[in-house]
Amino acid sequence: EVKLVESGGGLVQPGGSLRLSCATSGFTFSDFYMEWVRQPPGKRLEWIAASRNKANDYTTEYSASVKGRFIVSRDTSQSILYLQMNALRAEDTAIYYCARDYYGBSYWYFDVWGAGTTVTVSS
């Protein structure tokens, strides 16, 4: 069974930092692109970061809203995806999800999602 389990959310003051984790199991972690997506209260899902697979040297990509503040990384020995979040702002308040990126039927889609972890940025 493929599983993604996020953790590390919580309440943090503006300007603070948090590190989210996404523990994965049931698939070969190094073979897949992995993504971080968030949903602010009352808003749509927003893609924020990607970690490409081993074949693509685990290169990363970020949305403009988090670039320079957030860092996505992997622990390949433990099959964990991380999101280091720095200089947090009130607008970063959201439920954060990790997702597996899958290619099938000639297009890419997120086929497995975690349940999410909540981040609240407030003084």
Swiss-Prot record:
Taxon lineage: Eukaryota, Metazoa, Chordata, Craniata, Vertebrata
Domain Ig-like per the UniProt entry, residue ranges: 1-114
GO function term, MF aspect, one: antigen binding
Additional notes on this entry: This chain was isolated from a myeloma protein that binds phosphorylcholine.
UniProt keyword annotations, A-Z: Adaptive immunity, Immunity, Immunoglobulin
CDD domains for the chain: IgV_H
Native species: Mus musculus (Mouse)
A single GO cellular-component term on record: immunoglobulin complex
Protein name: Ig heavy chain V region H8
Signal peptide positions on this chain: none
Highest rank taxon of the organism: Eukaryota
GO biological process assignments: immunoglobulin mediated immune response
Pfam family, one: V-set
InterPro entries noted in UniProt: Ig-like_dom, Ig-like_dom_sf, Ig-like_fold, Ig_sub, Ig_V-set, IgHV
SUPFAM superfamilies, A to Z: Immunoglobulin (SSF48726)
